Amino acid sequence: MRFSASLLLALTGSAAASPIRAEEEIRVYDLPISLFDDLQGLDAAMKAAGREYIGTSLTVRNDFQEQNIIRTEFGSITPENAQKWDATEPNRGQFTFGSADQHMDWARQNGKHVRCHTLVWYSQLPGWVSNSGFNNATLQQVMQNHINQVMGRYRGRCNHWDVVNEAPRLMAMRLQIGEAYIPIAFRMAAQADPSAKLYYNDYNLEYLGPKVEGAARIVRLVKQYGARIDGVGYQAHLVTEPTPTQSTPTPSEEDLIKALRITADLGVDVAYTEIDIRMRTPSNAQKLQQLADAYYRVARSCMKVPRCVGMTIWGVTDRYSWVPNTFRGEGDALLWDSNYQRKAAYNAFLRGIQEPVN
């Protein structure tokens, strides 16, 4: 079975602060950051609200400040690159787990939940897969072996797995296997680690329209094949303002909620999996306030959708963010600046988690 034209179109497109009286007419995230020093961290606030985790992507490096923030603020890590296909199986049948093991060991030593990432993705895919010319049967064998080896090594240690990432762009699988490669991958993953929650993960799902509807169709497709899919990851690589690479700013809280519900209403969990909200640089006070407002909207939308189980920020500090090297002239996308100082966006995000849901 091949991708239908309509599917392709769809896819390519708590210890809280003292109460603040209403008459004070101030927003929590306008307060000096020092006033928040004794508050619970982000993950503790999320758990106090009855959800699973607040996480960050992780690249293990010798940076005490970054690691200390992760230990105190985050309950979950996502290996940023260490579990991708090119890192784990650079040559057919030759597996290298050194970096992935390091990340998994760090998580275990520090008591962190792990979102393992990612099994089947068009990018960071070795040429021996993408340019192989394998037929349908061989490609399925390759996918089966890769999933079995990688998931099997970390069986029982991954809370969530991103099984398929950005499905419509994976031409190697699509051209030979057709759209069936998606449910096939989920079926293989469920057999390799029955305890892990299995996710489809994609970008631009936060905007109402063909992309999120395409993700919903993938959920239905996997279920129609009798395979298990537990959740949809909304990457949330967003912007505060129109930029050369993204014309539409972070949606309103209401539209974010609607977008999450499009897949959550199909009986799966949802999560924000790779949050960063970039702007044109350099930043200024107004832009940083827009950043705070956007992070607040994202947090509130998750808290207002019962099946939104967690949120992962794609990095801790702007010092190491992937954004400036990928989107020229854009950046300042995270909660801590390059000097490890919390931005107003941190307080806004925390407030978005802590505020009661009406």
Curated annotation (Swiss-Prot):
Pathway membership: Glycan degradation; xylan degradation
| This protein's GO CC annotations | extracellular region
Active-site residue list: 166, 274
Please tell me whether the keyword Glycoprotein is annotated for this protein.
yes
Q: What SUPFAM superfamilies is this protein classified in?
A: (Trans)glycosidases (SSF51445)
Q: According to the UniProt entry, what is the EC number of this protein?
A: 3.2.1.8
**Where is this chain glycosylated?**
136
Q: What is this protein called?
A: Endo-1,4-beta-xylanase B
Q: Which organism is it from?
A: Humicola insolens (Soft-rot fungus)
Q: What is the lineage of its organism?
A: Eukaryota, Fungi, Dikarya, Ascomycota, Pezizomycotina
The coding gene here is XynB
